Regions:
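Catalytic phosphate/metal-binding cores of nucleic-acid and nucleotide-processing enzymes, i.e., regions
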Residues: 1-130
């Protein structure tokens, strides 16, 4: 490698910026949940989070992705604290952290215990009605 030049991948192209991986994940999640990707990844004063769904039981979603396939991801408490605070600011009743283990990998959703118990109760009531 010549000093002062960026390292190239095998095809000779520069690696994609981290933002492109995040954007791809956000668009896929928004499509899956029927939500809207927030402008500038929620960095504005009025639009918070990465994705917001609509309705009385709306969600504010914070997306986290790895830029290369990985067997693990480090979950940060600060992600939850920030998302919870943004829910309060926007009046959004529910929050979730969405993560994957690399580009084009399956997305996983982290919710709090209260919401999990609500989901479990709902699923059990559906089962009883069968």
């Amino acid at each position: 490698m010549i000093l002062g030049t960026a390292k190239r991948n095998k095809e000779g192209a520069k690696p994609a910026p981290t933002r492109s991986y995040s954007s791809r994940q956000e668009k896929a999640v928004a499509k899956a949940v029927g939500g809207k990707v927030q402008k500038n990844s929620g960095a504005t004063d009025f639009q918070k989070g990465d994705i917001v769904t609509s309705g009385m039981n709306s969600f504010l979603l914070e997306c986290k992705t790895k830029t290369t396939p990985s067997a693990s991801i480090s979950i940060q408490k600060s992600w939850f604290d920030k998302n919870r605070q943004e829910c309060l600011l926007t009046g959004t009743p529910h929050q979730a952290i969405v993560f994957n283990f690399g580009p084009d990998e399956e997305n996983h959703y982290i919710i709090d215990e209260y919401l999990f118990l609500e989901l479990l109760d709902h699923l059990n009531s559906l089962e009883e009605n069968i």
